[in-house]
Structures are given as C-alpha cells and as structure tokens.
Amino acid sequence: MSTGPSHISVCIACRNEADRLGACLESVAWADERIVMDLGSTDDSVAVAERNGARVVRRDAVPIVELIRNEIAAHATHDWILVLDPDERVTPGLAAELRRAAGREDVDAVVMPRMNWDLGYPPSNPNERYEQQLRMYRKSRVQWPVIPNALPQVPDSRTYRVPSTDDTVLVHDRNRNIPEVLDRIVRYAPLQAQSMIDRGQVFSARAMFVSLGTRAKRQFIDGKAWRDGVPGMLRAAILVGFHFYIWAAFWQLSGARRTPEDDRFVQRVGRWLERGQHGYRAVTAPARIVGGLGDRARRMFRRA
C-alpha cells in the first residue's frame, strides 16, 4: 500500500550483473525503496545490491524479464513503480522529472526518453537518440504485459512525457560487446517469434522482406547511421540483424514449410536484383564505391 502519492519504489530484475548493478542503484539512491529480484546470480550481484541499500528478493531464473515485471512490483511497498534494468542509469535531470510526476494526481504513467548505447556509443540522430519508454506507473492502475519487449499501454490523457534532452534521459548501456549482442538475440528472438504466432500472425516471405526492408531503411537511411562512423553502421546492422533472427525463428516455429507462394516471391526478388539496373546496383553500391576508392588510393601510392 502506498504511503503517499509521491513515494516511488524502484524494481530491478538481476542475474549476474555485479559490474553494472552498483551504478544503476546509485543513480536512484533518492528513491523511497529499491528492490532487486535476483534470478540466481553466481557473481556478487546480491552483495552489490545489499551494499547499496536495496532489498533483495530471490527467485528462479526466467528467460526474459517481462515474465516477472508484475511479480517484482507486487513486492513493492509503494504504488508508483519505476522499472529499471541493471544496465540502465537515471540521470539527475530525469530523477527530478520523475519525482515531480509522482506528485500529480492526474498522471498514472510516465514516458521517458531512453538513450541506448551500443558498442560504447549512442546514436547522434535525434530520432534514434531518444527512445520513448513507459517505465514508471501506478501499479494499482497499470499492469505490465507478459510479452517480449512490450510496454504498458496507458491513455495519453493519463501519461506524463518527460522532455527529450540529454539531461533527462534514462541511459541504457546495452550491447557492450558481441557476446552480449548474441545473448540478447538467443534469449529474445524465439520468444518474440512465438508471440507473433500467439497473436495469429502467419509467416510469409513477402511480410518478412517488407518488415526487414523497412527496418533497414529506418536504421541506415532515415537514421543516417553513417554519420556515426563504424559504431553507427554496426549498431544499425545489429538492430536489423536482430529482427532477421526473429523472422528466422518465426519461420522455423511456424513449421519451417517451403511454399510455392513464398518461392515465387523470393525468386521474383532475386530476378529483380539480378537484372543489375535497380536493386542489385543499389545493394552493391557501397561495395563498389569502397572498391573504387581503394583502386584510386593504390594508384596514388604507386605514383608517389
């Protein structure tokens, strides 16, 4: 039971995150309560949590945290729940916004900008730099959906949106290295694919190509990934690749059936690319440009 409209409980699910959990907890030292649900850590995660003043609750591991968001919230003393992962940190500016929002009777949820860091760098494009995340809510009025990567849906009239600035972000230090990328894919791709099946979606090659093409356009072209150099291009490739694995899992979990309709569509795409005047030249343009620059550089060095 909440002891007041402005009291906030921070809820964190954790498994073997001792190297990052401390910074996460320190960033919310201002909160009225901090709960860490440990999922069978074999490192010093529990000691780190207790050393930082958090209350530790233990349970068996689960593949994804969405399965236990509501369970963690049930352990909280207060109505306002701030959901964090161990690889996230609340900036001082965001903390001030959250405390103000918690004191408003007309608000049931708070959407905040999250800045995702991949391979040590955040995106510079404003459209990609600030990912809108509903991460604070009243548990008496909102339930967390048990779906991979899903967020609660709350009417805009009952939602407060934190301004998107670097001073008011939730810092997300994800995908620090390739093993972390692969771990995320292995855990989430099959479950997201299964959720697509559970919602009644039917696999088709056309839908897969449209989805992946749309995501590639968003990341590489609309998101101007090239402006962030190698980290930007790798980030875009990781995000598109993640969805490729979701579709691969979707096809496999749907029965891995090869159908004439899918074959015809894929073959049409292949012939279109093979003609070389449109898609093939567009797809191979980066390689041809790099190759041309390399040839030019070699000629310059030979002349020198």
Regions found by a protein language model. Give the residues of each.
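N-proximal low-complexity "stem/linker" segments adjacent to membrane-targeting elements
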Residues: 1-27
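Residues at the starts of beta-strands that form the adenosine-phosphate
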Residues: 7, 32-33
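Acidic helix N-cap motif at the loop->helix transition within catalytic regions
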Residues: 19-22, 43-52, 93-94
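A conserved acidic beta->alpha catalytic loop
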Residues: 27, 38-48, 61, 85
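Short, structured coil segments at secondary-structure junctions
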Residues: 30, 51-53, 132
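Conserved donor nucleotide-binding strand/loop of the catalytic core
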Residues: 46-75
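Catalytic-site signature of metal-activated, phosphate-bearing donor transferases
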Residues: 66-73, 80, 91-257
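Long, positively charged, glycine-interspersed low-complexity recognition regions
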Residues: 251, 257-304
